[in-house]
Amino acid sequence: AGWQCALMAPTEILAEQHFRKLVQWLEPLGVRVAWLTGSRKGKARQAMLAQIASGEAALVVGIHAVIQDDVVFARLALAIVDEQHRFGVAQRLALRAKLEHQALEPHLLMMSATPIPRTLAMTYFADLDVSTIDELPPGRTPVVTKVFADNRRDEVIARIRDEVARGRQV
């Protein structure tokens, strides 16, 4: 608990879609989702920056505004870049640099729905480590992924809360 996540999308429309869906999913669980774009100005922007710096905002969704100098994260642990091919090396490094004041570097997840040939991807993203894990560590139980219809959301939330109350991972 107390860690933060930043999700950066290349357009305000895509970022807003992510924001709206994440608010719908996470705010009922008590997770504060922040919306940060270049169009947010003045007192509203300062209030949002304060929530990010204090750690009150656990998930920050935005566009390039997420990597501006005045955005300071309290405990950034995960940076997600959607449509990663739309951002250059400099933007990815700026997002990672948000943790220079801490002893650890955030995990970086890059997503894209655009098929990029493997050779081009390996050339374009040569600054990144790529690993493939194709077996479980000894003694590890396989993860079971389940998909539920949206009309069962309350049931899923209740089950997650029960598991967390028992001290289990979810």
Model-derived features: positions:
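Inter-lobe coupling/hinge segments of SF2-like helicase ATPases
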Residues: A1-V170
